[in-house]
Amino acid sequence: MFINRWLFSTNHKDIGTLYLLFGAWAGMVGTALSLLIRAELGQPGTLLGDDQIYNVVVTAHAFVMIFFMVMPIMIGGFGNWLVPLMIGAPDMAFPRMNNMSFWLLPPSFLLLLASSMVEAGAGTGWTVYPPLAGNLAHAGASVDLTIFSLHLAGISSILGAINFITTIINMKPPAMSQYQTPLFVWSVLITAVLLLLALPVLAAGITMLLTDRNLNTTFFDPAGGGDPILYQHLFWFFGHPEVYILILPGFGMISHIVTYYSGKKEPFGYMGMVWAMMSIGFLGFIVWAHHMFTVGMDVDTRAYFTSATMIIAIPTGVKVFSWLATLHGGNIKWSPAMLWALGFIFLFTVGGLTGIVLANSSLDIVLHDTYYVVAHFHYVLSMGAVFAIMGGFVHWFPLFSGYTLNQTWAKIHFTIMFVGVNMTFFPQHFLGLSGMPRRYSDYPDAYTTWNTISSMGSLISLTAVMLMVFMVWEAFASKREVSTVELTSFNLEWLHGCPPPYHTFEEPVYVNLK
């Protein structure tokens, strides 16, 4: 029965499918918001109205893309679908909690959309800094609704994290050690630990902001002995691990894709890859104040956060060079998924290099809150996380659906998207170096050229999004069945065929390990 299957589901494959569909839908909303931003900035002068409505759009774009697109697709979609199949578990450890994790997201999304519909909306930026987010600068219910939205999304992610940690540690075959699980499983495990440690701090921060706004507390108000800088520390102690939460599952997917299409039986440097992800996860928690170089910290504090941030480049470099070593000498198959993976490696590295530039506290004083920062994090998100999602989608689409995509169109889609995102975000480095500030709806006309090119690039990306919707429709309409998939020890998720039966591994699986 439809309701029993999709509303009260306890099946990891169905819940994974729900996450993928929800994430795709939210991605459309986030894309629409981003196109509003680029339409406003395509020429000098005003299009939408004042800076408040513009900043409401910017804030909603960030929240939708992070909490309702990337996280549901990577952790909820790919994580739910693949982790049990990869470790030979019959399902997740807590199947009903898994269902609740998903169904907390639509109400959360509804609250976020409601926040923009009441009063003037939450034009705070996704950081929601007081005093701008206080009840003076943002009177009315908008910011409160945003905070409640974040509470629900946060609970959803915490429950999901508990579920994945329990599943991965406890539901492997007895003979399988943690160091025999695939890298995607490792990446989800580390991501879940990060979520579990980071989200409660965000919850504390936004709850204090909620009481400051409504119950007259003064956690972040100097008039009552509070400090707005405390909020920034709490937010970024969550916010920096969050950006690693967004990219780590992508690392796992890229490892699988590169290994598979290089014709290798395993990735290069498995243990090094695991160590690198663990290091990134640990270091991600001790670099948060590099987002706050302009708030007047001591010089020795700034020196620490600069050097600690640069240390993260080492395990990241281990991963990049291990992917290249996996490619080396392989029988490379130029499939669409491989193109996404290669694009990921190149563009993620570019984004990482601009991150190293921003890690220098003295340089960051000049570049903070300019478009250079926007360019940096969109290279690692829009061309890191999203390229990993796209690569994972075209690679595992046959597993999820039983049908194959049209390879030619998938390659054309990659090409259009590649051109589009680079045309959108590469010029933003120049804008930032020229001093164009973030979060303003208008600019001096000296910045016109690069902004116009950037906005044209966003329209190219839009055509890519529309082409992908068509490709998925075409695949389901044509019904090309999957013929064969080459099995190695590194892609056991394909063991049961495409798509796999509703219940897999119902009996304990026999594992013969070397």
From Swiss-Prot:
Annotated residues for binding of O2 = Y244
Stated membrane topology is: Multi-pass membrane protein
What is the protein name for this chain?
Answer: Cytochrome c oxidase subunit 1
Q: Does the keyword Membrane apply?
A: yes
- The residues the record assigns to binding heme a3 are H376
For this protein, the parts annotated as crossing the membrane are: 12-40, 51-86, 95-117, 141-170, 183-212, 228-261, 270-286, 299-327, 336-357, 371-400, 407-433, 447-478
Coiled-coil intervals in this record? Answer: none
